[in-house]
Every structure is written in structure tokens, then in C-alpha cells.
């Protein structure tokens, strides 16, 4: 293995001169990024190209659920504080919160579930959910987050477990240049490409 700096030098680059790579203001008119969709909207609607108007921003956080780890055979159902059962309710809560805002382009995903102690004969004592909420409308994103917070409080009270939200990142959506979008539409029409006005759920550099 080699470091990134070593790789740059191997390719003939000078890592110490990285500041010289900054493009000077006024030396460019615009940026346009061509990218695969990373989704299925264009495929399912049978359009060749998408003209993007907004880039969604992710808000990422963990939900920590603290229950009690007990023997799975010796602990009656009514005496359990199963962190994974509570976590399952919160996974559904994330999905339902995003569903209510889907018309505004918001989505919610629980992509990772960490369960402790992770044994088949032990009632889960602790669970961490890794959550990704994103959208193009800040107020819609906030409504999703507020719904999740409220459900987290309800689950904590009803199930007798500890629930804590740990914020990781919270970025802001970006609106793209309308004139450039209009120019892209004109080019598509001129060349005979079918196109769809849409938002980008994935982040992009341009």
C-alpha cells in the first residue's frame, strides 16, 4: 500500500503545489456534470436524459436504543425490554415519516443496524440505527426529522427503553442554475433527445 501523496508523486504530480490547481474566478462560464442517474426514474419513464434542477442534501444521524440484555429462554415476553423490537418500530417510523413527505422529494433510509450482544439466545440489549434522510426542500426534511424525534420519544416511553439521537451531518440542498437548465432543455429538443425535469437524490460535485 502507498499513501495518496506517494501515488500523486508517482503519477508526476507535485502535492505541495495543490493550491495552484484552483480555477481562477472569471476563467470559466459554468460547470456541467454528466452523470448516470444512479436510480430508476429515467428507465421506468423511458426518458433518455434528466435535466436536474436541485441536488438533495443528506442529514445523517444515529439512533441509539438501550434496553436490557436477558436470556432468551428464561425471560418471559412481558418482562422484556428488547432493544431490537423497539428499533424495528423506529425503522418503520423513519419509513413512514419519509412516505408522508415523498411528494416533496424527501426520502429516509436505515442502512445499518448494529445489534448487541448479537447472540441468538440473548434478548438484544442495545441497538444502533444509522439513518440517512435527504431531500431538496429544507422544510420537508425538517418535518421528516421532527416526526422521527416524536416517534423516538413515544417508543422510549411505551417500551421502557432509552432512545438517543446522535447527529452526524446536516447538509443543505442546492438549487442549480435555471438558465443552464433551460439551455439544456433547448439542446435536448434540438437534438431530439427525450428528457425529464427532475431532482438529483445523489450528491454531485459540479
Where are these regions (language model features)?
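Midchain, well-structured core segments that form catalytic/ion-binding scaffolds
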Residues: 1-139
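Charged helix-capping and loop-helix junction motifs
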Residues: 48, 149, 179-182
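Active-site proximal loops enriched in glycine and acidic residues that flank catalytic Cys/His/Asp
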Residues: 112, 133-135, 145, 167-169, ...
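Extended hydrophobic-aromatic, low-complexity segments
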Residues: 122, 140-144, 196-198
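Short amphipathic alpha-helices in soluble, non-transmembrane regions
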Residues: 143-153
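Conserved short beta-strand edge segments in small beta-sheet-based binding/regulatory domains
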Residues: 157-167
